[in-house]
């Protein structure tokens, strides 16, 4: 049974981590199927970590206390308060000391994997250029537009019934047609979208970001143009196209540093996977010989 397998303290720590990272919930909220899936993930992860920490490459690898403290602070930041973190630990019968110990183990595994990659060559400008020109479609930026004001429909409130909401936004639109430069001011006063505090600014959006009803209008608009009143499932909208950035191809110079980092990371991950496969195969062979 998964619940029996996950009874020890170490596994409870792993369960807390897997539940949040894989399923986005607390361990107690996992279904039986999810719990069994978590059990398989944990078993595989512990098997790999054990192999890594027993490998010759792990000899002499030490985690400095400052790195552990930084990682612990990162975990604590996910919770509203130290008390909330303690409650989460208590719910899984864990304590801070035990969790720190498991965190130190994770960090040491990561450090060993970093050491394994120490001899890898750096990604050269030629490597980056070849990837860029062979995958040019990955570096196309679609057209982007800026916009937005919203009045929601909510029949539970007299001021937000469908008829009242429509009247309000038509009044706003009439006001803006005379002075579109007042868009940000009107958005801050009347918009019920979270973007109101930024003057209704959605930022640069690409097709498919907004509701289809809004997309269909926005990407036909010219710079400085106001839309008619539009309706989506959440209410009425007026769009203002503040600017238009046409679709374009990013240059190699623009993306070279980020692409180099991406390719370097991909190379490291591929090498680590290859190293782990070899390590696990060697361990399996030794176990077979020992039991043969």
Swiss-Prot record:
Domain PpiC: 148-243
Pfam family, one: Rotamase
Keyword Isomerase: yes
Root EC class: isomerase
Enzyme Commission number: 5.2.1.8
GO molecular function ontology, one term from the record: peptidyl-prolyl cis-trans isomerase activity
GO biological process: nitrogen fixation
Key words of the record: Isomerase, Nitrogen fixation, Rotamase
Catalysed reaction, written as an equation: [protein]-peptidylproline (omega=180) = [protein]-peptidylproline (omega=0)
Cysteines joined through disulfide linkages: none
PROSITE patterns: PPIC_PPIASE_1 (PS01096), PPIC_PPIASE_2 (PS50198)
Family: Belongs to the PpiC/parvulin rotamase family.
Function, in words: Required for the activation and stabilization of the iron-component (NifH) of nitrogenase. Probable PPIase.
NCBIfam families xrefs: nifM_nitrog
Annotated protein name in UniProt: Putative peptidyl-prolyl cis-trans isomerase NifM
Source lineage: Bacteria, Pseudomonadati, Pseudomonadota, Gammaproteobacteria, Pseudomonadales
């Amino acid at each position: 049974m998964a619940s029996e397998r996950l009874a020890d303290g170490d596994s409870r720590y792993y369960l807390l981590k897997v539940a949040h990272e894989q399923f986005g919930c607390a361990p107690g909220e996992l279904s039986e199927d999810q719990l069994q899936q978590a059990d398989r993930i944990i078993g595989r992860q512990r098997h790999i970590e054990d192999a890594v920490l027993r490998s010759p490459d792990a000899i002499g690898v030490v985690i400095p206390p400052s790195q552990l403290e930084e990682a612990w602070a990162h975990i604590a930041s996910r919770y509203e308060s130290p008390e909330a973190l303690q409650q989460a630990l208590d719910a899984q019968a864990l304590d801070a000391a035990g969790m720190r110990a498991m965190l130190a183990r994770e960090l040491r595994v990561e450090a060993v994997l970093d050491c394994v990659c120490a001899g890898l060559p750096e990604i050269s400008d030629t490597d980056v250029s070849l990837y860029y020109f062979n995958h040019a479609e990955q570096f196309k930026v679609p057209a982007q537009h800026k916009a937005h004001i919203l009045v929601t429909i909510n029949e539970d409130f007299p001021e937000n019934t469908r008829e009242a909401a429509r009247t309000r936004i038509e009044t706003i639109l009439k006001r803006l047609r005379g002075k579109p430069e007042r868009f940000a001011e009107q958005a801050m006063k009347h918009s019920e979208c979270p973007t109101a505090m930024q003057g209704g600014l959605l930022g640069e959006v690409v097709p498919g970001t907004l509701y289809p009803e809004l997309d269909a209008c926005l990407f036909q608009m010219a710079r400085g143009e106001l839309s008619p009143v539009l309706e989506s499932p959440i209410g009425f909208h007026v769009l203002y196209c503040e600017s238009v950035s046409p679709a374009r191809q990013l240059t190699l110079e623009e993306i070279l540093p980020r692409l180099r980092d991406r390719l370097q990371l991909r190379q490291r991950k591929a090498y680590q996977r290859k190293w782990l496969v070899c390590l696990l195969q060697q361990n399996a062979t030794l176990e077979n010989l020992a039991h043969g």
